[in-house]
Amino acid sequence: MTQAGRNRHYSIDLIRQMADCDANYIRLLKLMPELESFRSACLQSLAGCASGPSTEGRIPDFTLRDFVNVGALPADAICTREFAMSSPVGDGEEVRVRISVVEIFRYTSTLEIVQLTRVSPWVSPPGIMIRLYHDAVTAEAVAYQGHKAFLAKYATPNSRMYHRDEKRQINEFLGEWLSLCLQDGRSLTSPTFICSA
């Protein structure tokens, strides 16, 4: 190995990573307009905290009942949308993707995006858990195919066989997947999320 090869190392491009995560948040808001209610509640909560002495620095709580029309949504997900796209292998079968909100907290929400249609018997359909940070207006992949807690950078080789920039690649893949849903997908479910303001 040459001296130049030894000195070459991966450096994190934080600006690019944050831009990818911010763009993913915007894509998710377009795919699931229901998420705007979570974002609005978070911003109102932040504004209420800074509004003055009447709040005494306490951030007001809101619960799922503030968002969900009781009984109108499935028990396993607070909000679910499904999209269908044409198959990339051209066999005429539609590829279905489901996006579900699985957790809601004051400033964050957790979503799961999974491909329901198996395109190939040799490849598992992808699945990603996404954390949305409503106060920071960003979204990042926190788990992919059962792997989680990704570091920003890995040494190579490593025991898990991750790429040096595994986290960036997963967030980039998420962006491409969401873009595909926006461009070629059609929603199979109408919005079921009702805000009780």
Where are these regions (language model features)?
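An exposed acidic His-Trp-rich patch
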Residues: 115-196
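Hydrophobic residues positioned within well-ordered beta-strands of beta-sheet architectures
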Residues: 97, 111-113, 128
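Short beta-strand segments that buttress and anchor functional surface loops
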Residues: 85-87, 112-118
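Eukaryotic low-complexity, non-globular regulatory regions
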Residues: 1-94, 98-108, 179-197
